[in-house]
Amino acid sequence: MRHPSREIMSELIHDQWTKDSIFAAVIDPDGNIVAKGHTTVGPDNDPTAHAEINAIRNACRKLGVSRFPDGYWLYTTFEPCPMCASAIIWAGIDGVVYANNPDYRGKEDNWSFISCEKVIEAGSYLHKSEMVKDFMIDEIKAYFI
């Protein structure tokens, strides 16, 4: 599959607009959504329950793995924070596509005090992940501002 996919990101952006939460999804090598996750920090009383972490957890459970085989990607409607970017590396995800960035966060806290790109670069000795930044940003940034 070629990344990025407008179809996949459009679905996640639609989910965010209609369900009022940041969304992420793990994508298999054939371009299928394996599992989605959305931010549940408040409802779960869990500061690690970001959309990306929840999507990775759900996909790992579904596939019965703790590290993805080659070809899996993560799509998310917001730039992954340092924790989520680290999880992308540890999970063996080959690429990440995100829509919005902290410049358009509105009232949201800026958890990206270290950019996703810097974390992915620093962890490249463990696992190399590609990155597509600001994909379809014009379709999502109005949600935050």
Give, region by region, the residue ranges found by the protein language model.
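Short beta->alpha transition motifs characteristic of CBS
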Residues: 32-41
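Cys/His-rich metal-chelating microdomains
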Residues: 62, 84-87
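Zinc-dependent deaminase
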Residues: 1-18, 86-145
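Short beta-strand scaffold segments in enzyme catalytic cores
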Residues: 22-31
